[in-house]
């Protein structure tokens, strides 16, 4: 939670214990206790992430990831301060794949988008592409 709050600037929208029913979630068992934190961006309609921690019993940590593979998740985020986000990420001790760099890509409407992009891993080894658009 601290990484998403202090580095990426998200705020807590929900934070509570959830006891699993054993039905809806494809992990854990009935009665397992979890903590669910939902973080929101400036626009919660298109920018929320749920962080689920198994608290009782604790589940083993997955092995660290160094590269993306088939089926892996990439979080794509947009903000207005790629340089500041990079500085906060370095101060936090996050693994940086690529510091802020200029990037151009064709947008959904066919027009070129100019961005400063930052590529990094969160503390749970999920890959994040943080983009600052220059319109």
Question: Where do the protein language model's features map onto the residues?
Answer:
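Core segments of cupin and vicinal oxygen chelate
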Residues: 1-46, 91, 111
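Vicinal oxygen chelate
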Residues: 6, 19, 44-48, 52-124
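Short beta->alpha transition motifs characteristic of CBS
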Residues: 130-135
């Amino acid at each position: 939670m601290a990484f998403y709050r202090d580095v990426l600037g998200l705020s807590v929208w929900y934070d509570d214990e959830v006891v699993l029913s054993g039905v809806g979630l494809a992990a854990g068992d009935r009665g397992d206790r979890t903590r669910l934190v939902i973080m929101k961006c400036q626009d919660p309609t298109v920018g929320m992430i749920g962080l689920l921690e198994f608290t009782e019993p604790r589940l083993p940590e997955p092995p660290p990831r160094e590269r993306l593979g088939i089926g892996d998740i990439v979080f794509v985020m947009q903000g207005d301060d790629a340089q500041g986000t990079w500085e906060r990420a370095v101060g936090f001790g996050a693994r940086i794949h690529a510091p802020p760099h200029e990037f151009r890509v064709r947008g959904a409407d066919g027009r070129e988008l100019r961005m400063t992009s930052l590529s990094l891993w969160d503390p749970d080894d999920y890959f994040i592409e943080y983009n600052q658009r220059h319109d």
